[in-house]
Amino acid sequence: MGGQLSIEARLKSIIPQLTFDSHKGACGKVAIIGGSVEYTGAPYFSGISALRVGCDLAHIFCHQDAAIAIKSYSPELIVHPFFKEDYDTNEVLKWLDTVQALVVGPGLGRDESVMEATLSILKQAITKNIIIILDADGLFLINNHLDLIRGKKNIILTPNVMEYRRLCDVLKVSHNTPCNKVALMLGGVTILQKGQVDEVSNGSYTVHVKHVGSPRRCGGQGDVLSGSLATFVAWSKLNQDFQDEDLICCSVAASALVKECSSFAFTEKHRGVIASDIIESIPSVFDQVFGQNKIQLIYE
């Protein structure tokens, strides 16, 4: 890890204590832009993971053809059928003033009109006091508009292997370019590069997450990560002592949590592990990793 960053100490400050006098919203609110007629599971996985980690409210802004399916998956999620012929971006922007974190991309699809609307929202969301996580089709979208995020300290990119390669292609660098160099090329945005060993960097700080995870790679794990990360960064924004480096700490925390959940689910379901099994393990695994007595993270 480059520089000195006390991840455990920051997380102790960031993770809110549960008290009987707290109110709804005190533990954070997040929003997800995603969901299309083909992909209804991804935004659900992201939103429900955010709730399982511990945020209070999760909004999903999706294509109207995906809304009923997502609503039927869980009554816990607040689903807005936004992408339609007469859409108004202000419908989303007014809600973004009430949340601390925004995930863009899960199941979004690549319909041209949806991409155009999402880009319009993203341009304005970046100026708000929220953290924005770009994943999946959100990364595909931003590859053509990297100047929009360059130098922005409220941005986290969460590319998998193929998404990282596409990002490197756009930047005209080798696929083997280290994460910290790519982060610097983008002006210090935070990157959580997913892999067997997740790497987190903003160019100044670099952390390798050493939790083992699972050999089972089922669909939806990236969505579980994006939702989990959204809750951690929402908590960080609610903290009066917020620091830009908290995005590194939150990314490490989310990575460690999802890898441990994946490992736990694998011991129970083996080859049959699906994303829902990983999500189901979040509450108990969270207490093991982030218990009140000691935060147990493995990284370097």
Curated annotation (Swiss-Prot):
InterPro entries given in the database record: Carbohydrate_kinase_pred_CS, CARKD, Ribokinase-like
Keywords associated with the record: ATP-binding, Lyase, NAD, NADP, Nucleotide-binding, Phosphoprotein
Enzyme Commission identifier(s): 4.2.1.93
List of residues binding (6S)-NADPHX: 107, 160-166, 223
One of the GO biological process terms: nicotinamide nucleotide metabolic process
Catalytic reaction annotation: (6S)-NADHX + ATP = ADP + phosphate + NADH + H(+); (6S)-NADPHX + ATP = ADP + phosphate + NADPH + H(+)
Cited CDD domains: YXKO-related
YjeF C-terminal domain: residues covered: 7-289
List of residues binding ATP: 194-198, 213-222
Cofactor: Mg(2+)
A GO MF term: ATP binding
Membrane-spanning intervals of the chain: none
Protein purpose: Catalyzes the dehydration of the S-form of NAD(P)HX at the expense of ATP, which is converted to ADP. Together with NAD(P)HX epimerase, which catalyzes the epimerization of the S- and R-forms, the enzyme allows the repair of both epimers of NAD(P)HX, a damaged form of NAD(P)H that is a result of enzymatic or heat-dependent hydration.
Family indicated by similarity: Belongs to the NnrD/CARKD family.
Protein name per Swiss-Prot or TrEMBL: ATP-dependent (S)-NAD(P)H-hydrate dehydratase
Species in which this protein is naturally found: Entamoeba histolytica (strain ATCC 30459 / HM-1:IMSS / ABRM)
